[in-house]
């Protein structure tokens, strides 16, 4: 399904994949899987390879492949969060020879390790607890904690009081980004009070996100009944229990809840499964520029009587419903790889279709601190104005620096297989020291060398490094990368909501409002890439992931190209989403190919099928180059149709976005009701929240992969087949490794069954299943909307053409351009 694995040919950034699968399991014959394979997303429904010619001469990723010192975490190309290998171009070969001969290279490993500043801190203010029944607890905590006498500061601020620009200014005040925090952030969700719940049977749980890593709590350990009169007593009790010195924080938090009766029905188990009829919301087919913030109506109390009842209960002196006072004591640990990152804590009700109960956003400033902690009540906030939210949540966080510099496969426990592809596999893994869940892609060096894809593989990693260093909220982040003599490893955020393809396949199509939300976030992601001179080139549902809250994250940069200042000629992509200029224009194409794919994607989301789908690739290319787009009645609003037509203009110079890139798309009337700043900060409630029972939930991924056994991955067995590559070949991967290369030999025996278990899956093209489409007679042919300046609509291009493509066997795609057009 997902294209997490890409296989490209020799010295071109090429690829061509058609990875959709018909819901009934039928193969439509579109066997032109671009750069073959699926090595770059999570699950992979298809893997097929075929080399493609290109007019590029191999001068790819020059700024990246010449990098000589490699960071252990994806912070930037020259700012290191966990130390470097320090491999230089002059001694790379010697280093690799030493590695294979078991010779230590400690000196080189430490040559470029950045200095860690560990300024000591007066711990008196770090562990203070501020109890406040009103909404001023956060401000009070800031006033109390900000001590001018401390040599370092720990500042906690709320979203409402600190804008993005202000946060950036505050970050600059704390020093340059060369002092990136390296440590662990332990977060304990203790309890909440005065929640607005629908009934005493409500089952609150928490989704906690930090640097795109997710934690999904179980249900409460117990539910307590409290009086408002006792709030101050509770605050005093927490103040008495505060930990002023970090060295004394060994108290077991679970003991504090032993006196509560466990009447919640949770019994310490995972979240209960939701009945099937609660998972599906009615599909409506037409809404013109409606407010997205009204989509949360199912996530708030809509009955006025219930609202008044719940609101009044918040100020009464009587006892609360048990469900309004959940006690969790759930603890999780996050890897701190960046600086000034946001800690997002959202509360939901599993018993009422994951109703939203409130949110807290914190910005723990831990710059240059060896230790820091805080133990405090925070007022829950709504995401939008009309959400009914009240109550407070008690949160404790503790930050500690770590000394570890190098990571390898032994630091991760494999949990589930998420996908397979040409180069290797993608696994759900758990980092052993923090228990954090990640996705780990394992690529076989032998296959990469055989397909001559070393430069592209390193280029993909460096694009991920670039996007991580200039973070976008809607792009999957790279956390770690390292290598052994046999394999390459990329460790990224695990998005538990699964891929958008999986949800689209199950539901058939989305409402216009839901599609608009996803497209708007994709516009921000593509704008971020284009502003950094990166063309994505493989936009499709398989490469779009959902997080636990329902926001999207773009993944799979296997076909992306960096440093694109003008045009490129590489023939790559997925058939249904290819732009016509990629087929027809011998002068190459620009970043506008991404916006064409975006137009195809929104059409597919709303209508339920691809606008250019055909039973074979030759007909599909003809439709892309010359076919008319047909809209079913009452599926897209007039603004939506105008937006799609603007994106599907065959002349890239007149396509929507050609003048001002993503900013031009954001100004379109289709997005008139979007608050872009709020969307960028993820303040707009997603129209759909994935149903999850834990942070390790894989129910939104293909069970064909997730049910496969991975027990052999965690066993250290002798090497069965392949031997390490020669030192000369190993040296070619010097720009990839993040692990201490003197320790690579000890990992050589861990991962040799990957190639044995790899396989090629049958390719196909996906049409969402049974979306209750309108009858044929309701299809509208928009004949009058052709662009008179569109020079690509000339049917004469079809004259005297003959096929130059082989549609059998390995699906080789010949991208020879003849007389300004692709031979169809």
Curated annotation (Swiss-Prot):
Note: Present with 3850 molecules/cell in log phase SD medium.
Similarity comment: family membership: Belongs to the protein kinase superfamily. AGC Ser/Thr protein kinase family. cAMP subfamily.
Entries under PROSITE patterns matching the protein: AGC_KINASE_CTER, C2, PROTEIN_KINASE_ATP, PROTEIN_KINASE_DOM, PROTEIN_KINASE_ST
Chain residue ranges for the region called Disordered: 1-37, 125-152, 221-272, 285-327
A single MF term (Gene Ontology): protein serine/threonine kinase activity
Keyword entries, A-Z: ATP-binding, cAMP, Kinase, Nucleotide-binding, Phosphoprotein, Serine/threonine-protein kinase, Transferase
InterPro entries associated with the record: AGC-kinase_C, C2_dom, C2_domain_sf, Kinase-like_dom_sf, Pkinase_C, Prot_kinase_dom, Protein_kinase_ATP_BS, Ser/Thr_kinase_AS
EC class: transferase
Protein name: Serine/threonine-protein kinase SCH9
GO CC terms of this entry: chromatin; cytoplasm; fungal-type vacuole membrane; nucleus
Transmembrane region(s): none
Sequence ranges assigned to domain AGC-kinase C-terminal in this UniProt record: 672-748
């Amino acid at each position: 399904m997902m294209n997490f694995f890409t296989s490209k040919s020799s010295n071109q950034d090429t690829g061509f994949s058609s990875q959709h699968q018909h819901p009934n399991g039928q193969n439509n014959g579109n066997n032109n899987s671009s750069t073959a394979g699926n090595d770059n997303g999570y699950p992979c429904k298809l893997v097929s390879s075929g080399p493609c010619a290109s007019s590029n001469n191999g001068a790819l990723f020059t700024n990246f492949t010449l990098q000589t010192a490699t960071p252990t975490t994806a912070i930037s190309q020259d700012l290191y969060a966990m130390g470097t290998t320090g491999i230089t171009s002059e001694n790379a070969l010697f280093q690799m020879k030493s590695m294979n001969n078991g010779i230590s290279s400690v000196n080189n490993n430490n040559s470029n390790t950045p200095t860690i500043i560990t300024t000591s801190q007066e711990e008196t203010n770090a562990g203070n607890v501020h109890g406040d029944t009103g909404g001023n607890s956060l401000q009070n905590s800031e006033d109390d904690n900000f001590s001018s006498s401390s040599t370092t500061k720990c500042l906690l601020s709320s979203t409402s009081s600190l804008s993005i620009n202000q946060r950036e200014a505050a970050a600059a005040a704390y020093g340059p980004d060369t002092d990136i925090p390296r440590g662990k952030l332990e977060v304990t969700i203790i309890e909440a009070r005065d929640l607005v719940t629908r009934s005493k049977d409500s089952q609150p749980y928490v989704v906690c996100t930090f640097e795109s890593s997710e934690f999904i709590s179980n249900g409460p350990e117990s539910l307590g009944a409290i009086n408002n009169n006792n709030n101050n007593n509770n605050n005093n009790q927490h103040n008495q229990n505060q930990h002023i010195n970090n060295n004394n924080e060994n108290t077991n938090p679970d003991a504090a809840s032993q006196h509560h009766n466990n009447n919640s029905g949770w019994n310490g188990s995972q979240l209960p499964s939701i009945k099937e009829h609660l998972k599906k919301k009615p599909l409506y087919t037409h809404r013109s520029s409606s407010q997205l913030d009204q989509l949360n109506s199912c996530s708030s109390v809509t009955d006025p009587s219930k609202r008044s009842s719940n609101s009044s209960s918040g100020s009464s002196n009587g006892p609360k419903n048990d469900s309004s006072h959940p006690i969790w004591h759930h603890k999780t640990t996050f890897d701190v790889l960046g600086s000034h990152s946001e800690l997002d804590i959202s509360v939901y009700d599993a018993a009422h279709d994951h109703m939203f109960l409130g949110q807290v956003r914190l910005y723990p400033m831990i710059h240059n601190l060896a230790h820091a902690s805080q133990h405090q009540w925070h007022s829950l906030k709504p995401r939008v104005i009309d959400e009914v939210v009240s109550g407070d949540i008690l949160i404790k966080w503790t930050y500690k620096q770590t000394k570890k510099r190098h990571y390898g496969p032994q630091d991760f426990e494999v949990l589930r297989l998420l996908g397979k592809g040409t180069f290797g596999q993608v696994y759900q893994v758990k980092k052993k020291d923090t228990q954090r869940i990640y996705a780990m892609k394992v690529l076989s060096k032998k296959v990469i060398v055989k397909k001559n894809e070393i430069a592209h593989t390193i280029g993909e990693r460096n694009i991920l490094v670039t996007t991580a260093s200039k973070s976008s909220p809607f792009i999957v982040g790279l956390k770690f990368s390292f290598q052994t003599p046999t394999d390459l490893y990329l460790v990224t955020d695990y998005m538990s909501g699964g891929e958008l393809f999986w949800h689209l396949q199950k539901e058939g199509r989305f409402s216009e409002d839901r599609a608009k939300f996803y497209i708007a976030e994709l516009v921000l992601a593509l704008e971020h890439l284009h502003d950094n001179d990166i063309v994505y080139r493989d936009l499709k549902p398989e490469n779009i992931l959902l997080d636990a809250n329902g926001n999207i994250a773009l993944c799979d940069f296997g076909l992306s190209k960096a440093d694109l200042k003008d045009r490129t000629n590489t023939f790559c992509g997925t058939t249904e989403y290819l732009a016509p200029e990629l087929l027809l224009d011998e002068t190459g194409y620009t970043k506008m190919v991404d916006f064409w794919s975006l137009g195809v994607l929104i059409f597919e989301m709303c209508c339920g099928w691809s606008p250019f789908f055909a039973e074979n690739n030759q007909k599909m290319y003809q439709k892309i180059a010359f076919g008319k787009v047909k809209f079913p009645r009452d599926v897209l609003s007039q603004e939506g149709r105008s937006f799609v037509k603007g994106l599907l203009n065959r002349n890239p110079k007149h396509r929507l976005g050609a003048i001002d890139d993503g900013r031009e798309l954001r100004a379109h009337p289709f997005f008139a009701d979007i608050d872009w700043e709020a969307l960028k900060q993820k303040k707009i409630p997603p129209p759909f929240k994935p149903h999850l029972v834990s942070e390790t939930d894989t129910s939104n991924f293909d069970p064909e992969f997730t049910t496969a056994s991975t027990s052999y991955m965690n066993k250290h067995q002798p090497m069965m087949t392949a031997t390490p590559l020669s030192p000369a070949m190993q040296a070619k991967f010097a720009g990839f490794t993040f692990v201490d290369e003197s320790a690579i030999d000890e990992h050589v025996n861990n991962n040799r069954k990957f190639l044995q278990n790899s396989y090629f899956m049958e390719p196909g093209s996906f049409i969402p299943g049974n979306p209750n489409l309108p009858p044929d007679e309701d299809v509208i042919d928009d004949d009058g909307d052709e662009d008179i300046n569109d020079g690509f609509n000339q049917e004469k291009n079809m004259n005297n053409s003959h096929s130059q493509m082989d549609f059998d066997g390995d699906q080789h795609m010949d991208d020879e351009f003849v007389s300004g057009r692709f031979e169809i």
